Amino acid sequence: MKTVVFAYHDMGCLGIEALLAAGYEISAIFTHTDNPGEKAFYGSVARLAAERGIPVYAPDNVNHPLWVERIAQLSPEVIFSFYYRHLICDEILQLAPAGAFNLHGSLLPKYRGRAPLNWVLVNGETETGVTLHRMVKRADAGAIVAQLRIAIAPDDIAITLHHKLCHAARQLLEQTLPAIKHGNILEIAQRENEATCFGRRTPEDSFLEWHKPASVLHNMVRAVADPWPGAFSYVGNQKFTVWSSRVHSHAPAAQPGSVISVAPLLIACGDGALEIVTGQAGDGITMQGSQLAQTLGLVQGSRLNSQPACAARRRTRVLILGVNGFIGNHLTERLLREDHYEVYGLDIGSDAISRFLNHPHFHFVEGDISIHSEWIEYHVKKCDVVLPLVAIATPIEYTRNPLRVFELDFEENLRIIRYCVKYRKRIIFPSTSEVYGMCSDKYFDEDHSNLIVGPVNKPRWIYSVSKQLLDRVIWAYGEKEGLQFTLFRPFNWMGPRLDNLNAARIGSSRAITQLILNLVEGSPIKLIDGGKQKRCFTDIRDGIEALYRIIENAGNRCDGEIINIGNPDNEASIEELGEMLLASFEKHPLRHHFPPFAGFRVVESSSYYGKGYQDVEHRKPSIRNARRCLDWEPKIDMQETIDETLDFFLRTVDLTDKPS
């Protein structure tokens, strides 16, 4: 049976050996070049392929159409993936009549995603296993073909568990590969309600937070012990690594991070104490705990910290351009709630941020980004993170002022992007759900959905294509010049301070603000083309929490990622939004101050937006990247958002001349 194999690591080597032993004909093997920054303790798939006389390739992007075509020419009957690190596109998966199968190092549907071996140890699991499953477009979600369970012993560390998983994988493949070859397999669908998903781990994820229980920290040590990078902490600015540890449940009470004793080296935790059995100071040699204490100059009562002492004193400087806008002012509030951010902001007004102007860690300048270029360049250079939130993002302006949209949204932002490249600063760029345009996918996916817009004579797409081109420019700068970036795509965020009623009076506002103005003034609610267009509305608090986690960037998981931020469960048509808003309005305690409801009125989009407008029937996000990179889920129901948004705007209305 002819197969094409995607493989890496020890699991890749044993998978190839198992296929050959089962009589499969391997036409080609796709693998990865080794990362020089990664400790290669595992077998080489490339070397094994060469020794076996099998063609082997390591393309940067195996999903490129040229590689898809080359794989198609190999006419594989079945495809296998053994610890290949990139998602394989659906076009490749569909090439094999018998399907594609992946070996995953957990008991699916638990621990989908990356580094399951390390995550099960971090989380203190007592059981894991290996799963062979059918590959589908969504990672690790296909039907299960075979599973083998293994126990995790209390003294297991990452490398011993790795060896157990390899042994189990050999057994599983020996039992299952002949059945696949003869088309004699039983597949069991995964239970989605039991699925968990985890993202990539980096060395920075393994710092020891002493306020946590000793058992949690011990599990961290087990999960990243040699040959992984190790768990670490600091004495002042001196980093040290913990290679092995032991939990003491009944240690004397002390402040977390305090040294209880040096022989043995015992550190107080949030619950219990952690004995450092072996460790390493800086880039030195491994030594026992008592010697490590001596090397680090520790005595009873010394304090350890989770980050360098100098780093702990310096706040992260965040530059927000457009700080007075809807996202900018809510994000400022979230950042200032913590004690480790310094926020620098620029905008043409300050009404929404007036509550922060006296905050010691908020620095505001009133100005226009097209004029204050020197100030902007200086602050890009000065700050750590840059968020250029300035944009014209109201649909009526796309047809009314397309050139102004292009000049501000594209040209001014491109200049800021180039400053970030010049000074090597991290940029978090607000893309938009508009870039998906008229995509027909059920869920708009950051990595796979096509971005489809209308013809040139429809100027409403100038905003979408301006943002899309900036996305592509940022991506290219990341690939070619090492720009550290994250693109985020908001899906219809709503909440207090979204636009204002004066903007709605001239038609330059988002949908809910316009609808609220209609209710306040007693004018008919206009349903553009019947209001059947569906959107997924997201509470600003949910959106800002996701954006805050992007700024935090735990373990650098957001670097180089595109992340939809939306609530796929809060889908409603504009007509349904209007009905929900009306119901909330009729129950509001200030209702009697406003005129009677004037009804709904259906209008054509051309009469409202002008010629050159096209609408989009649906726009629902896939949020798998947000789940993977941010451990984030939207929580707030749409009705709650509507109630709070309406209440905010009604309380801004001058009621002195309103009927009571």
Curated annotation (Swiss-Prot):
Name the keywords, alphabetized.
Answer: Antibiotic resistance, Lipid A biosynthesis, Lipid biosynthesis, Lipid metabolism, Lipopolysaccharide biosynthesis, Multifunctional enzyme, NAD, Oxidoreductase, Transferase
Pathway membership of this protein?
Nucleotide-sugar biosynthesis; UDP-4-deoxy-4-formamido-beta-L-arabinose biosynthesis; UDP-4-deoxy-4-formamido-beta-L-arabinose from UDP-alpha-D-glucuronate: step 1/3; Nucleotide-sugar biosynthesis; UDP-4-deoxy-4-formamido-beta-L-arabinose biosynthesis; UDP-4-deoxy-4-formamido-beta-L-arabinose from UDP-alpha-D-glucuronate: step 3/3; Bacterial outer membrane biogenesis; lipopolysaccharide biosynthesis
Positions of the site: Raises pKa of active site His? Answer: 140
The protein in question is named Bifunctional polymyxin resistance protein ArnA
**Which positions does the site annotation Transition state stabilizer cover?**
102
Spell out the family assignment given in the record's similarity comment. Answer: In the N-terminal section; belongs to the Fmt family. UDP-L-Ara4N formyltransferase subfamily. In the C-terminal section; belongs to the NAD(P)-dependent epimerase/dehydratase family. UDP-glucuronic acid decarboxylase subfamily.
- Describe its partners and assembly state: Homohexamer, formed by a dimer of trimers.
Which E.C. number(s) belong to this protein? 2.1.2.13, 1.1.1.305
- UniProt-annotated binding residues for NAD(+): 347, 368-369
Q: Which Gene3D superfamilies match?
A: 3.40.50.12230, NAD(P)-binding Rossmann-like Domain (3.40.50.720)
Catalysed reactions listed for this entry: UDP-alpha-D-glucuronate + NAD(+) = UDP-beta-L-threo-pentopyranos-4-ulose + CO2 + NADH; UDP-4-amino-4-deoxy-beta-L-arabinose + (6R)-10-formyltetrahydrofolate = UDP-4-deoxy-4-formamido-beta-L-arabinose + (6S)-5,6,7,8-tetrahydrofolate + H(+)
Q: State any GO CC term.
A: membrane
Q: Name one GO molecular function term.
A: UDP-glucuronate dehydrogenase activity
Annotated region Formyltransferase ArnAFT: the residues are 1-304
- Kindly list the positions annotated as binding UDP-alpha-D-glucuronate: 393, 398, 432-433, 460, 492, 526-535, 613
Positions annotated as active site in the UniProt record = 104 (proton donor), 434 (proton acceptor), 619 (proton donor)
Pfam families, sorted = Epimerase (PF01370), Formyl_trans_C (PF02911), Formyl_trans_N (PF00551)
Question: Segment Dehydrogenase ArnADH: which positions?
Answer: 314-660
Biological role stated in the UniProt entry: Bifunctional enzyme that catalyzes the oxidative decarboxylation of UDP-glucuronic acid (UDP-GlcUA) to UDP-4-keto-arabinose (UDP-Ara4O) and the addition of a formyl group to UDP-4-amino-4-deoxy-L-arabinose (UDP-L-Ara4N) to form UDP-L-4-formamido-arabinose (UDP-L-Ara4FN). The modified arabinose is attached to lipid A and is required for resistance to polymyxin and cationic antimicrobial peptides.
Tell me the residue numbers annotated for binding (6R)-10-formyltetrahydrofolate.
86-88, 114, 136-140
Question: What GO biological process, any one, is recorded here?
Answer: lipopolysaccharide biosynthetic process
Recorded superkingdom: Bacteria
